Amino acid sequence: MKKKILHHTSIMIIFAVLVTFLAASVVTYSKLNTYMQRGVREEAQYICLAMDEYGDSFLTKKLRTVSSSRVTLIRKDGTVLYDSEASPKKLANHSDRPEFIQAEKNGKSESIRYSETFAKKTFYYAVKLDDGNVLRVGKTVDSIYSTWISSLAVLGLLMLLVLIPVSYTHLTLPTI
């Protein structure tokens, strides 16, 4: 009888831990994604201010040392003038990118889509500059699945910490 109760209790504990872990992962992913997007928008605004002050010369290779985001300057016709991650000469015309098209129309835009350069889902924020060019800042977005997988080791350790004492107690208790 005690074995059966302990077995059911262990299953309930494992189930509760898994449900809590999944719920916490979803909430954490959502919050981190929101903070990342806000950070990209703010970074784009800071770069715009610096470009107003220093011109396009602000966009140098040194920008990579202070920013983990991908920064791209795109001419009105879609030609890439600067990219912090790839040579502009190797990049295709960006006039068909959704964030570029919307920034041209509305002054600013954002999109989440697959990036050929990063080979990952990427959040882009684009701003139309006074000279007609478009500044685009992008950051890769981990999927909730990859976030969950990377946390599985921690979950496994926590489950061991819970199950070992329960199992030890069960094995060392005298049976009556």
For each feature predicted by the language model, list its residue ranges.
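Juxtamembrane segments flanking the first transmembrane helix
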Residues: 1-80, 85-91, 146
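Short, conserved loop/turn and helix-capping segments at secondary-structure boundaries
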Residues: 41, 93-97, 151
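Helix-start (N-cap) segments at beta->loop->alpha junctions
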Residues: 49-52, 130-155
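Membrane-proximal, non-catalytic sensory/regulatory domains of signal-transducing membrane proteins
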Residues: 53, 90-131
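Structured catalytic cores of enzymes that bind and process phosphorylated ligands/cofactors
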Residues: 70-72, 122-129, 138-140
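Selective recognition of signaling/oligomerization transmembrane alpha-helices
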Residues: 150-168
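Conserved small/polar residues in nucleotide/adenosyl-binding loops
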Residues: 169-175
